[in-house]
């Protein structure tokens, strides 16, 4: 499988001698599709049927869902909850976006969960985004401002100027 195009609306792949358009985005989805195609081949399924089914695949809700507004602003929703997942999402966006497009990341960490990933998530977001907004994300029994403070520790000094904190998630998304 070869990636011919990778854009916010999907992937154009070359699979053997066929071109395949899917509504999925990013190298990681191309790898997943390669695994699907290979497994189908091993199971003896017809290539044409496998390609037809693959072309109908859609994102899982909350995983790299993209929306394009009437004013051509692309919004991507991904509930990445680990540092590696966030890094993959932001690297995928950066590989697709043009240099004049701004990447604004809104990120939060859940309460009563692994505290060690909070500074890592903030470090990754601030290193790979044009602007970052730290916000509350289901704080459970914890103080949301304390969670955000623990995230901010991970921001390197040269990236701090492009970050801000808005505790209210709805306001942060606006």
Residue spans for each PLM region:
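Nucleotide phosphate-binding/pyrophosphate-handling subdomain across enzymes
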Residues: 8, 16-131, 153
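C-terminal helical cap/extension that packs against the catalytic core
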Residues: 122-174
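Short, solvent-exposed polar/charged micro-motifs at secondary-structure junctions
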Residues: 1-4, 173-174
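A short, compositionally biased
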Residues: 4-12
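Structural signal for short hydrophobic segments within the conserved structured cores
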Residues: 1-2, 18, 163-164
